[in-house]
A protein has these predicted regions:
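Short edge-strand/loop segments of extracellular domains
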Residues: 99-102, 151-159, 232, 236-242
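Extracellular structured ligand-interaction cores
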Residues: 20, 94, 129-135, 145-147, ...
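Short, structured patches in soluble enzyme cores that scaffold and shape functional sites
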Residues: 101, 120-122, 136-140, 150-152
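Short, conserved beta-strand element in jelly-roll/cupin
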Residues: 123-143, 199-202, 236-239
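Non-heme Fe(II)-dependent double-stranded beta-helix
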Residues: 1-18, 24-125
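Terminal signal-anchor or tail-anchor transmembrane helices
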Residues: 329-354
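Double-stranded beta-helix
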Residues: 131, 141-213
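Non-heme Fe(II)/2-oxoglutarate
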Residues: 166, 202-207, 211-328, 332-335
Length: 354
């Protein structure tokens, strides 16, 4: 599925300086609408008045990463990552989607001043650029809609931040994410990193450096387009030659067992199951994901790294972790936070059922 990439020098420059960039026209409006219709049909599989458990619009259960429209978007986004990494020999994440209901309907809350879940997805032992994450927007998102919020330029201070905060570095080694405290946000503010809500056109993709502080932002009251839903497919691809045999085995497991992964697509691959089940849950790979191209991206078919074509940049570096997990007050807080989020999702689901 070869597509012309709109990723250009200006996008590369923005990724380097700002930590994020927006690429237009990854999908046509018609393709976006077709995908939205498929997700809407999937939502109808739930009992009446039940919405799948989500966190800030993210739906990471139910094998959403293996749904047909998700794979369609993933394959369409490949050309962007191929241009970014300067190689077509890539591995993909099998990541979450986001479906955000309009707060105007009373089922979701609006954005609140000075309240967010700003975080980084890269742990302190990774040195430099290890991944570029992406979100393909099937609906337009203006600054006041459901969208991505970033601390612009914060990726430049990633190592400095963790060097001075050993508890934070230890927490990041849990390899989930590190959620910033108010004092952490002030650190980045002191470096001139402004909080920006990113506008993304329909069919576009927003890319961000995994060291960038970011979060999904809720819609603001009195927004320009009240009633607008959010539909986003998250995609991350990195050079295939970065992967170890252990990582490749995990990718094959994810594909063969129809389970999802985190955004780490080559190094440090993490898999997770489908969670709560419903009728319509993907239990087999959709036909669109059985092509040779899709199997290469999933790690099922190996690339030829000796064919004389570019394999992309060299493997990124790691530093030995000095941050063995200990039960400090800070990381106990983070573990409790994650467990609470899981409990909230389960309770919300059971509440909707009954």
């Amino acid at each position: 599925m070869e597509e012309k990439s709109m990723f250009g020098p200006e996008n590369r420059e923005e990724l380097t300086t700002k930590g994020y960039t927006v690429v237009r026209d990854v999908l046509s409006n018609e393709e976006c609408d077709n995908c939205i219709q498929q997700y809407q049909r999937w939502l109808q599989e739930f009992p009446q008045d039940v919405f799948p458990p989500s966190m800030h619009s993210l739906i990471s259960q139910f094998n959403t990463g293996h749904m047909e429209p998700t794979w369609f978007v993933r394959l369409k986004a490949k050309s962007v990552f191929a241009k970014l990494w300067q190689t077509s020999k890539l591995l993909t994440s099998i990541d979450a989607i986001a479906i955000g209901r309009p707060p105007e309907d009373g089922e979701e809350s609006f954005a609140e001043p000075n309240k967010s879940w700003l975080h980084v997805d890269q742990n302190a032992s990774r040195v430099g650029l290890h991944a570029v994450q992406g979100g393909v927007y099937l609906e337009e998102a203006c600054e006041d809609d459901w969208t991505l919020e970033v601390l612009e330029g914060s990726h430049c201070y990633f190592e400095e931040f963790f060097e001075g905060r050993q508890d934070a570095a230890r927490i990041s080694e849990l390899n989930i994410f590190y959620k910033l405290t108010e004092d952490d946000v002030k650190f980045y503010g002191g470096k001139g990193c402004q909080k920006i809500r990113v506008s993304v056109p329909k069919g576009g993709i927003v890319l961000w450096d995994s060291r960038l502080v970011h979060a999904n932002a809720r819609p603001r009251k009195d927004r320009k387009h009240p009633g607008l839903w959010r539909y986003v497919v998250f995609v991350s691809m990195t050079p295939a030659h970065w992967a170890s045999e252990t990582d490749m085995a995990k990718k094959r497991y994810a594909y063969n067992n129809v389970v999802m992964t985190s955004h780490w697509s080559s190094q440090g691959v993490k898999t997770h199951g489908s969670g709560l089940s419903i009728s319509g849950l993907p239990t087999k790979i959709p036909e669109i994901a059985t092509t040779n191209e899709a199997k290469e991206l999933a790690g099922m078919v190996r690339y030829d790294f000796e064919d004389g074509k570019s394999n992309g940049p060299q493997k990124p570096t790691w530093k030995a972790s000095k941050n063995a997990i200990t039960f400090t007050r800070a990381n106990v807080y983070t573990v409790c936070f994650v467990l609470c989020q899981v409990l909230i999702v389960i309770v919300a689901y059971l509440f909707n059922l009954f």
